[in-house]
Amino acid sequence: MPPPSGTPAARRKTSTEKAMFDKQTYIARRKALHAKLSGGLVLLPGNDESPANSPGNTFRFRQDSTFLYFFGLNRPGCSGLLDLDSGEDVLFGDDPTLEDIIWTGPQPSLAELAGEVGVEKTQSAAHLQKRIEAAVAKGRRILFLPPYRGETRSTMSRLLGIRADRLASYASAELARAVVALREVKEPAEIEEIERACETAGKMHRLAMRMCRPGITEREIAGAIEGVALQHGAGVSFPSIVTQHGETLHNHDYDHVLQSGRLMLIDAGAETAMNYCSDFTRTFPVNGRFTGRQKDVYDIVLAANDRTFELAGPDTFYYRMHNEASMVIAEGLKSLGLMRGNMQDAVGVGAQALFMPHGLGHQMGLDVHDMENIGEKYVGYDEETLRSSTPGLSSLRMGKRLKEGFVITVEPGIYFIPALIAKWEREGLGGGFIDFEKVREYLDFGGIRIEDDMLITYYGNRMLGGNRPPVTTAGIEAYMNGG
């Protein structure tokens, strides 16, 4: 039962109030951020509780990931301030009141929490306004990232005197680049956490394969695998996609009864108690046996997935991995009679995007789409790599050169989306590389996606998650039938 409406939701105890890693980790991260910037104040607001339907009944609290990275605290209502001129770091927030303690039990003071992450100075949340106003009056610049929550926009607007709808235009590109440069290269302790999340995701997908059979609902499987995520951490890392209609890329409707002959697509991941994420996708037959047509298409997607692991490593451009996966898919579809002509030319104009209208993947870490709130132009692209306007490539979240320590996903797929197929045929799209008469035979096929998580290493890459969920057609069939 939530506390009554008079109880401040922002004071409620969270699952992980203590620091995530040791204090030296956070001291070193903040020091590294100081070193990348000069002059002014860096404002890093944490998240507040977000009401579901009343102030006392909130959604599960999720701290802002950049605040977590530099301050490591999972308490609502906190903000961090880095003074780039003096080198001082300050944590702003409020101590629990007696009313809070009655409802949540004893909680550490703000000063105690600050000590766990190596911050020597704390001040009340109300004092942050005075600190910002004093800095602005002296003409000092305030560096901040674009806020993505309504509550944070409102707070930032009040603190900075900038209209909420204009905050993004005042956000600091210099700070964005600095934060991305630090967060995108994962530390060993972070990789261990991501491995835990991947191990949990593997359990989720294996359970789904064992449960899957005609006659049960998608919801039954969704509930079971999300329970596994909660048993082993903080729950799912994003709303699970559990569907026998894989042609809908982000399908969150769980009401269908599973039918023999359909393919089940599950895109689901876990989040650890320390908020590190995983993201796997598997596609398998509802009745435990692939048809010949399903196997043919599945093996093309698996070959594209395998090709990305052959390529990935330091200095490889991610857009090249996408293009190579696209070539494998195009050549495979040509072998089935769905595409025709020179496939290099076809991929050059994006004809394969009819079947894979999304990019190959994304970075992953404290966010499942890591740092996406900061902006893809910083996370996925840079001065060296600009986004393409070609179909397929235009949807690629990341194209830039990979570095050792990156954690990325690879998720090629083939989908037969009736509305998209009709549009392309009606408008004469595809450059003559699509055999629409043959494609129409697949309108009831659905979709297939295979997604794994990988770490970029000095020598190339390695798959994360230990015991990889079954991925070959033979392995899936054996596992689903008790093997």
Go through each PLM region and give its residues.
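Active-site neighborhoods and metal-handling regions in enzymes and metal-associated proteins
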Residues: 3-483
